[in-house]
């Protein structure tokens, strides 16, 4: 039990001693009465740019909390129940083979870690390379355009998030989120991810964190195999029996399917095997780049160079009444770069990435428009995937091949003309670019909605619609185009023992929610099955 205090505001120049004094004053106690103080959340309140505050939420541990709280009447002070992940009792159903985890992104990593902690010794199969070899492969692709179809920005140890920003924000309310953060810190992530309101690890640090968790899984008896691709599943009478990995048939009764949102060949295999799935909504658009200083000044005003203020971010939304579509920023990367993120030959994809320091010149974000199954041709549950492929192919051709991206300045995009020269903002896309009209690789309604959104967002961030801001095509992998349907026990509704998990299954979005989903799936497996013999 702890006392939670919210909305403790400090100035930018205050140190943590001021925080402690304010806590003692609120609770009418001395600092000697406090046995422990945990910072739960730290955020920047920049609503008044001439008086920016650092806002804290804390948990205070002391003697006689209830007695103390009974005499304090403050809406920002309450009891906080400290909930730990409860120990799970193993089930009784016999399992002949060790559980298998396919995919080693956030969902697969935390499913495997949870299973390993409980003695289930999972076997992991990841189609891509380990994170060190994968990094070499990806950097080579960015340099010479040679795409490895099995190991790239989408596939390999760490998942797609390993080449993003390592963002740890989430909207889900689940006590497992705290466990995920604790495990990341144990594995080498900075301690502040536990309380920063917009926490991130950064691509550079995340790689080491992932390797350390892999070694922990192995220490606990798990097995992690790279360059190992799931090719087929076999089930009988609605019950999973085996899988094929790299041509080898493997007995399997419990399969955590954590394939990520870009494993299109796996989706196709599952569709052929009649695994229940549906098309789902997602969003497509472009990457937009501005000078990071412009965003900093807009968000922080004259304080934008203060040492306690990091590179500013933004989150923008707009609803087009005319088009009945949402336009929004997504995966905003302060001080980052736009990266080539393809995973199929002849199809172009862009994404954003930041290192931990977020200290590069440009701010970039996806600028995307919602699309739904009604926009996709046909009736197949894979029709959203084919929709993505169509526009990615157009973008590839528009860029001239070799994974160069089509680029257009915002001013030219708004006026439907090809750009001919750059302004202050230099495109950061890692595989080169060509000036092209982006309307040639996007649906007309997406182009129109983007134009509306840019005008609206310029009212919120002055300079958002500046003539020389950069648009890079195209962003299509905002979320999975498919949902793999599952029941209350988190199994496929028509294949017992198959556990669709994380972002690729359509049940998560981002590192934390995917990791939590992986833990929940592992818990269901543990509760169902006895330890493998």
UniProtKB/Swiss-Prot annotation:
Transmembrane residue ranges: none
GO molecular function: oxidoreductase activity
InterPro entries tied to this protein: FAD-binding_protein, FAD-depend_C, FAD/NAD-bd_sf, FAD/NAD-binding_dom
One Pfam match: Pyr_redox_2
Name under which the protein is recorded: Uncharacterized protein Cbei_0202
Organism of derivation: Clostridium beijerinckii (strain ATCC 51743 / NCIMB 8052)
């Amino acid at each position: 039990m702890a006392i939670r205090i919210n909305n403790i505001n400090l100035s930018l120049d205050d140190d943590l001693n001021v925080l402690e004094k304010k806590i003692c004053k609120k609770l009418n106690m001395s600092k000697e009465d406090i046995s422990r103080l945990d910072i739960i959340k730290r955020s920047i309140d920049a609503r008044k740019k001439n008086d920016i505050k650092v806002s804290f939420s804390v948990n205070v541990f002391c003697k006689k909390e209830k007695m103390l709280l009974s005499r304090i009447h403050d809406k920002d002070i309450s009891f906080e129940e400290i909930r730990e992940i409860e120990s799970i009792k193993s089930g009784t159903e016999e399992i002949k083979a060790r559980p298998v985890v396919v995919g080693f992104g956030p969902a697969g990593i935390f499913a495997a870690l949870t299973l390993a902690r409980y003695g289930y010794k999972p076997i992991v199969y990841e189609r891509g390379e380990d994170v060190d070899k994968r990094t070499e492969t990806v950097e080579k692709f960015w340099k010479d355009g040679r795409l490895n179809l099995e190991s790239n920005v989408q596939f390999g140890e760490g998942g797609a998030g390993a080449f993003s920003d390592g963002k740890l924000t989430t909207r889900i309310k689940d006590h497992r989120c705290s466990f995920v953060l604790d495990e990341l810190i144990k594995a080498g992530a900075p301690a502040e991810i536990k309380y920063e309101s917009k926490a991130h690890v950064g691509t550079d640090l995340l790689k080491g964190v992932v390797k350390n968790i892999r070694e922990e899984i192995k220490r606990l008896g798990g097995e992690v195999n790279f360059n190992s691709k799931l090719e087929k599943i076999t089930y009988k009478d609605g019950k999973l029996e085996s899988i094929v990995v790299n041509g080898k048939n493997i007995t399997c009764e419990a399969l955590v399917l954590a394939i990520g949102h870009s494993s299109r060949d796996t989706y196709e295999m599952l569709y052929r095997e009649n695994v229940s799935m549906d098309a789902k909504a997602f969003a497509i658009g472009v990457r937009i780049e501005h000078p990071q200083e412009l965003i900093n000044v807009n968000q922080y005003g004259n304080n934008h160079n203060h040492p306690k203020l990091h590179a500013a971010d933004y989150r923008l939304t707009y609803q087009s009444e005319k088009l009945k579509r949402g336009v929004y920023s997504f995966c905003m990367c302060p001080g980052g770069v736009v990266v080539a993120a393809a995973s199929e030959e002849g199809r172009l994809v862009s994404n954003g990435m930041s290192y931990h320091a977020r200290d590069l010149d440009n701010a970039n974000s996806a600028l995307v428009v919602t699309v739904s199954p009604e926009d996709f041709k046909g009736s197949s549950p894979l029709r959203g995937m084919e929709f993505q492929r169509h526009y990615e192919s157009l973008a590839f051709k528009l860029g001239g091949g070799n994974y160069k991206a089509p680029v257009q300045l915002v001013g030219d995009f708004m006026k439907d003309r090809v750009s001919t020269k750059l302004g202050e903002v230099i495109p950061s896309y890692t595989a080169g670019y060509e000036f092209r009209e982006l309307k040639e690789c996007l649906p007309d309604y997406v182009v129109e909605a983007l134009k509306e959104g840019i005008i609206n967002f310029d009212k919120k961030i002055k300079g958002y619609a500046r003539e020389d801001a950069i648009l890079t095509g195209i962003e299509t992998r905002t979320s999975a185009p498919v949902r793999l349907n599952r029941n209350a026990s988190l199994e496929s509704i028509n294949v017992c023992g198959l556990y669709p998990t994380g972002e690729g299954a359509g049940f998560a979005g981002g590192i934390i929610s995917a990791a939590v989903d992986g833990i929940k799936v592992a818990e269901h497996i543990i509760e169902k099955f006895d330890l493998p013999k």
